[in-house]
């Protein structure tokens, strides 16, 4: 099977890369083993929250300029501030075109409220998520009886520290009892599958309506809206106060929805989606990827003109830690890591951890190297890249988006030259 591009990994980076390549008229396939990290995320995307020295970032352009000086090997630094901003804006346009109407400005970070009621600087958030400052003085944090993925009293306690009048309440929907037989089934995603049925909408409205009369804003867990935000908008039109939603513990409704929107758009535009498959071997001849062998296709290789590695970091098994060191399991690419295992981590759990910055070694075009030699038609994007800390620096979503589009533009340019 011949393709212009085969993308190994179906997470945020892989999907955005595929969508951008489709804009250039290239035929793409995505090989994905299972759920991506988006299923376990908040559904919000960070651009740059903090610098390597710990200084918080509010003005993105100035932050990117400082980052170039502090961390020249960071993926952003390799591209330059202006290029990063341009690609980020293009990514936001792609997301909107896919149906993910996210709120945010690439030039200026905003503060979203987290499930614990604290604030986190971010780039793009779902419109349901409350954003600071909250234009409400009387707030009711509403939990769902029996739902362990969200603790209303913890969120309320944090918000009270910001001089807000915050109460807590709980709704009990007997219609959800069918899920209570097994506590492991009473999760936000399973509740959403039930509440998203239009016939159940009035039940949720009736439960929230009495609380809405006594407050300016209701904050509740995101336990509905797997496909879209229609129910949230329907409730907001009818309730006497604003309704906002907070992400829950994984799996996350908002994260799954974002992934599904991108995946459906990719298939709608003619992309080949290969779920439940796994790349077992990649054949490289003379520094060029010629064949990609997958588990489900056995002796029928995929033959791409270009290949993209979007396999993620340790969480997605894009990187594997062993006693002897860190390795990239598909091709055995060169990995940037510390010299000894003792340097992988800091003793204080909350300090930035060196292992977070491990990843494949690439050139400035994000082409990785194998045994010191650049693989000419292979690009690495997203969390598998080295040189950034997605947790401490708050840049995971941005790096995925920016590197994906940079690789896509590079491939499209080279594909045009080869025709």
Curated annotation (Swiss-Prot):
Keyword Zinc set for record: no
Keywords annotated in UniProt: Flavoprotein, FMN, Oxidoreductase
Glycoprotein recorded as keyword: no
Catalysed reaction equations from the record: a quinone + sn-glycerol 3-phosphate = dihydroxyacetone phosphate + a quinol
InterPro entries the UniProt entry points to: FAD-dep_OxRdtase_2_FAD-bd (IPR003953), FAD/NAD-bd_sf (IPR036188), G3P_DH_GlpB_su (IPR009158)
Pathways per UniProt: Polyol metabolism; glycerol degradation via glycerol kinase pathway; glycerone phosphate from sn-glycerol 3-phosphate (anaerobic route): step 1/1
Cofactor names: FMN
Alphabetical GO biological process terms: glycerol catabolic process
Cellular component terms per the entry's GO annotation: glycerol-3-phosphate dehydrogenase (FAD) complex
UniProt-recorded Gene Ontology molecular function terms: glycerol-3-phosphate dehydrogenase (quinone) activity
Enzyme Commission (EC) number: 1.1.5.3
Pfam families: FAD_binding_2 (PF00890)
Domain of life: Bacteria
NCBIfam families, per the entry: glycerol3P_GlpB, PRK05329.1-1, PRK05329.1-2, PRK05329.1-3
Oligomer and partners: Composed of a catalytic GlpA/B dimer and of membrane bound GlpC.
Known role: Conversion of glycerol 3-phosphate to dihydroxyacetone. Uses fumarate or nitrate as electron acceptor.
Recorded family membership: Belongs to the anaerobic G-3-P dehydrogenase subunit B family.
Protein name: Anaerobic glycerol-3-phosphate dehydrogenase subunit B
The species this protein was found in: Salmonella arizonae (strain ATCC BAA-731 / CDC346-86 / RSK2980)
């Amino acid at each position: 099977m011949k393709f212009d591009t085969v993308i190994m990994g179906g997470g945020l980076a892989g999907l955005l890369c595929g969508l951008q390549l489709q804009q250039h008229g290239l035929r793409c396939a995505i090989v994905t083993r299972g759920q991506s990290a988006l299923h376990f995320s908040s559904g919000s995307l960070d651009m740059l929250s903090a610098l390597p020295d710990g200084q918080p970032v509010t003005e993105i352009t100035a932050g990117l300029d400082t980052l170039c000086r502090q961390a020249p090997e960071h993926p952003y630094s390799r591209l330059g501030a202006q290029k990063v901003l341009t690609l980020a804006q293009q990514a936001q346009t792609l997301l909107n075109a896919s149906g993910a109407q996210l709120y945010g400005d690439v030039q200026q970070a905003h503060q979203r409220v987290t499930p614990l009621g604290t604030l986190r600087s971010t780039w793009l958030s779902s419109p349901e998520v409350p954003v600071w400052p909250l234009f409400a003085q009387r707030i009711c944090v509403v939990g769902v009886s029996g739902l362990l993925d969200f603790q209303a009293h913890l969120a309320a306690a944090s918000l009270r520290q910001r001089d807000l009048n915050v109460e807590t309440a709980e709704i009990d929907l007997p219609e959800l009892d069918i899920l209570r037989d097994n506590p492991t089934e009473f999760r936000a995603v399973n509740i959403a599958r039930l509440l998203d049925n239009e016939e159940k909408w009035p039940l949720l409205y009736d439960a929230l309506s009495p609380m809405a009369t006594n407050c300016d804003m209701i904050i509740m867990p995101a336990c509905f809206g797997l496909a879209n935000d229609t129910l949230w908008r329907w409730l907001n039109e009818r309730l006497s106060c604003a309704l906002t939603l907070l992400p829950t513990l994984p799996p996350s409704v908002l994260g799954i929805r974002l992934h599904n929107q991108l995946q459906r758009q990719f298939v709608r535009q003619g992309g080949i989606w290969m779920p439940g498959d796994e790349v077992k071997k990649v054949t490289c001849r003379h520094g060029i990827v010629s064949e990609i062998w997958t588990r489900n296709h056995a002796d029928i290789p995929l033959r791409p003109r270009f290949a993209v590695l979007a396999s993620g970091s340790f969480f997605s098994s894009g990187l594997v830690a062993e006693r002897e060191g860190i390795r990239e399991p598909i091709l055995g690419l060169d990995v940037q890591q510390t010299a000894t295992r003792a340097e992988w981590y800091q003793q204080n759990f909350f300090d930035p951890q060196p292992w977070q910055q491990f990843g494949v070694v690439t050139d400035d075009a994000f082409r990785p190297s194998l045994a010191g030699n650049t693989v000419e038609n292979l690009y690495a994007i997203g969390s598998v890249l080295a040189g950034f800390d997605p947790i401490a620096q708050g840049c995971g979503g941005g790096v995925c988006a920016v590197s994906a589009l940079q690789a896509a533009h590079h491939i499209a340019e080279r594909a045009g030259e080869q025709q």
